[in-house]
Regions:
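Hydrophobic structural elements of the Rossmann-like NAD(P)H-binding subdomain
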Residues: 29, 71-74, 84
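A short, exposed helix-loop element centered on a Lys and neighboring polar residues
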Residues: 14-15, 58
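A short helix-coil junction within the Rossmann-fold of NAD(P)-dependent oxidoreductases
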Residues: 16-25
Length: 128
């Protein structure tokens, strides 16, 4: 199930959106995790699915370059979300990104001319 959601969900929605995105000159953002950079014990499928998303996005960016479609990955550091609380319990909020900060950087990415990039969102990294 994890691979279907994390990887195939990304692949299927990106490929299914091609004609619409091409016609509308839209962009695509996918989300990964810092786990994509290194496999972690007890997270083998999760880590590998996130690495697969990154490689897929980079490949599609190259394949679709001439169409003007831009596609990027957002890689947020540890973020304060209900799923994180469920999996890791209560943590010091000063060590976690807010979801609004991740959304702000996502919007900035959409406004950029980048394609095929992994945009790392780190705590107190951006001062715009």
């Amino acid at each position: 199930r994890l691979l279907r959601v994390n990887y195939l969900g990304c692949v299927n929605t990106v490929l299914a959106s091609y004609e619409y995105i091409k016609k509308s000159q839209g962009q695509i953002l996918q989300f990964t995790s810092s786990s994509y950079t290194r496999g972690r014990a007890n997270y083998a499928l999760y880590s590998s699915s996130k690495a697969a998303v990154v490689n897929f996005v980079q490949a599609i960016a190259e394949e679709w370059y001439k169409t003007g479609i831009r596609i990027n990955c957002i890689n947020p550091q540890r973020t304060n979300t209900p799923m994180r609380v469920k999996n890791f319990g209560i943590e010091d909020l000063s060590t976690l990104l807010s979801s609004s900060e991740v959304a702000r950087i996502s919007l900035m990415t959409l406004l950029s001319s980048m394609s095929g990039e992994v945009v790392d969102v780190k705590l107190k990294q951006y001062n715009y």
